[in-house]
């Protein structure tokens, strides 16, 4: 399986992101972000996403700098319990690391330590907004 990689750039114009969400059929996104998102323009984008596009947003920020494995496990649980179909990371390295691991572990057996399992590719879309 080869993942499709798309690079979007812009300064506060998120129309390409809207188009991408439409193209992949997102209905509910897991937004992995730290507290600093509230100071960023993109916060307004996600606050209005459901109203504008009908895409629900579930925020996950239950992790610390230099996140622990247990934080990722919590994130995978939130992804499964809420039925999110897309993972979005906004912020710095910790948000990116946690979100990438949530995507990576999302289709693994949650009764066994993820680090002891074979990595199995999955089709869950992943979007990174550094």
Predicted regions and their residues:
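ATP/NTP phosphate-donor binding region
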Residues: 1-86
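Glycine/threonine-rich beta-strand-loop-alpha-helix active-site module
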Residues: 70-130
């Amino acid at each position: 399986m080869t993942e499709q990689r798309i690079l979007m750039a812009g300064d506060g114009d998120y129309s390409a992101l809207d188009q991408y969400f439409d193209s992949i059929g997102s209905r509910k996104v897991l937004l992995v972000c730290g507290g600093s998102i509230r100071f960023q323009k993109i916060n307004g984008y996600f606050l209005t996403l459901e109203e504008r596009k009908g895409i629900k947003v579930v925020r996950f920020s239950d992790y610390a700098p230099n996140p622990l494995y247990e934080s990722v496990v919590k994130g995978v649980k939130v992804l499964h319990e809420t039925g999110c179909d897309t993972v979005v990371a906004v912020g710095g390295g910790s948000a990116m690391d946690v979100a990438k691991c949530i995507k990576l572990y999302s289709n693994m057996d949650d009764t066994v330590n993820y680090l002891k399992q074979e990595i199995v590719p999955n089709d869950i879309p992943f979007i990174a907004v550094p």
